[in-house]
Amino acid sequence: MGTGTGVGTALRTSAELGEGPTWDATAGRLIWVDILGARVHTFDPASGNRTVMSTEQHVGAAKPRAAGGLVVNLRDGVGLYDAEGRFSWLHHAPSPGRRGNDAAVAPDGALWAGSMCYDETPGGGTLLRLAPDGTATTVLDDVTVSNGTGWSPDGKRMYYIDTPTRRIDVFDVHEGGSRVTGRRPLAEVEEGAGYPDGLTVDADGCVWVALWDGAAVRRYTPEGALDR
């Protein structure tokens, strides 16, 4: 494991509710969303170019597509923007009082898209898996604030955060990624330190977690030990 920190400000910007930074390695750009501002932002650090795109609805996450464009987790479901900016629904499932939140792309190409109620009703959200062929499966249906999702480098474990639980949970992955079992806590964030929100997994298999209301980023080992 490396020991350098390399922490700095990549870009100064503003948002009503900024969320979901994603590195698009193909295009060499950073993508993130302003959920309540209904905008997708991009930034190319090599050129300094920035773009802002308005979305159809409040947007919880935006991920790059292999065919170009973006897949977006919106208020009423999951949609697609093609390379020319044309919009279409991939999974349209309106639910009054609820919106899409964080989402992540699995090693098999499926999109795991979370949702939550605007008033954070306990158990009012879900975690949905959208297969590459568009088939939708509800994996969890008792979620409050569905947030970070990520996979171990070997694809055998999935990590997941439902923010109010204060936990980073881990599942075992089966059937090429289409099924998860054995949910259990990997780590728990102590009272007063903030709440776990977004996450990503590094090449060492360690889990990096951003803490909402904690002004911090932590790294946990695959065994659940806090090492940064």
Segments and roles (model prediction):
Residues 167, 171, 188-225:
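Loop/turn-rich, solvent-exposed surfaces of beta-rich toroidal or solenoidal domains
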Residues 84-139:
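Hydrophobic alpha-helical segments and helix pairs
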Residues 39-41, 77-79, 125-128, 167-169, ...:
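A short loop-to-beta-strand structural motif that recurs across blades of beta-propeller domains
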Residues 31-33, 72-73, 111-115, 160-161, ...:
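Residue position within the beta-strands of beta-propeller blades
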Residues 35-36, 118-124, 163-166, 212-213:
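Short, solvent-exposed loop/turn segments at conserved positions within beta-propeller repeat blades
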Residues 12-27, 56-74, 95-110, 140-157, ...:
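Beta-rich, blade/repeat-based domains predominating
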Residues 6-12, 48-54, 87-93, 135-141, ...:
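A short beta-strand motif characteristic of beta-propeller blades
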Residues 171-179:
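Short loop/turn segments immediately following beta-strands, especially the blade-tip
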